[in-house]
Design a protein with these regions (language model features):
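Active-site proximal loop and beta-alpha junction motif in alpha/beta enzyme cores
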Residues: 2-83, 89-274
Length: 274
């Protein structure tokens, strides 16, 4: 409907419209759902949080046009977060595939700075996320919660990587959610080399932001891409997230950012009466 219209013409589309988008889907993987809400005007933080709570998905993304860019905020059912990869990819999907916003680059104003996204080849969408710098830590910091580990790393201020033996060990992890609160990180990323058709496989636990286990975690690539490059020298990476829904992600590492790519689809759209 909106294909071919300039950004300046999109104001007629604005209302509290929403789309449920599955991000980072694969052939059998259902990806991570995000609800993208297109706001016609700013809303109070408490109202945004209540909407996210009512919708109940791992993240709700709130989009609002600001000049030629887009304000983007992410809320779990319990808190606003500083960065969310899959909900950013979902927001990009809505702008490009539902609203037909033209242009090669889409820019989002976020709590993590200005992020950009674009359409890639082979049905992929790509977003640029800030690169994290990875430092080794003592495995005992995580082993009490996750069991025996090969390596452990701090990734930026809010993530840790726990390297397990193999894919079977990863899938067999049984984690006590309460014990994860003892780890001083928002994201606890368990990772192993290999997995069906990919370079590495992961599971991600985030109870501090209200997610016992995240279905697919685009922001984890901020740490995984540089960790893989340090390990192998390869700037590209393919990842399978071994959650119940499952997901597939791709990345390319640059000096200051990580381009994270995946496939998206709209599950349904509607109106938010708020």
């Amino acid at each position: 409907m909106w294909q071919g219209l300039g950004v300046e013409s999109l104001n007629v589309a604005f209302g509290h419209r929403l789309w449920w988008v599955d991000a980072f889907i694969g052939e059998a993987e259902r990806g991570n759902p995000a609800v993208v809400v297109l706001l016609e005007r700013p809303m109070d933080d408490a109202d945004l949080q209540q909407i996210a709570f009512e919708l109940g998905v791992s993240e709700t993304a709130f989009l609002r046009r600001v000049g030629d860019q887009w304000s983007l905020r992410w809320f779990t059912p319990t808190v606003e977060v500083d960065l969310c990869g899959h909900a950013t990819l979902a927001a990009l999907h809505v702008l490009l595939n539902e609203l037909g916003v033209p242009g090669g680059e889409i820019y989002f104003q976020t709590r993590s700075g200005v992020l950009s996204g674009r359409r890639l080849s082979d049905g992929l969408l790509g977003i640029d996320l800030p690169r994290a710098y990875v430092e080794p830590v003592d495995t005992s910091v995580l082993a009490d919660t996750l069991g025996p580990l090969k390596d452990a790393f701090q990734a930026g201020a809010s993530s840790v990587l726990a390297v397990v033996e193999d894919y079977d060990a990863l899938c067999g992890l049984s984690v006590d959610t309460l014990s994860l609160f003892l780890i001083p990180a928002s994201l606890v990323i368990a990772v192993c080399e290999g997995g069906p058709g990919v370079d590495i496989s992961v599971r991600v636990f985030a109870p501090r932001i209200g997610l016992a286990e995240d279905p697919v975690t685009g922001s984890a690539m901020c740490a995984l891409a540089p960790w893989w490059a340090d390990r192998t020298g390869a700037p590209t990476l393919s990842v399978r997230q071994a959650s119940a829904r499952g997901g597939v992600m791709y990345s390319r590492l640059f000096e200051k950012n990580v381009e994270v790519a995946g496939v998206t689809r709209t599950f349904f759209g509607g109106d938010l009466r708020a």
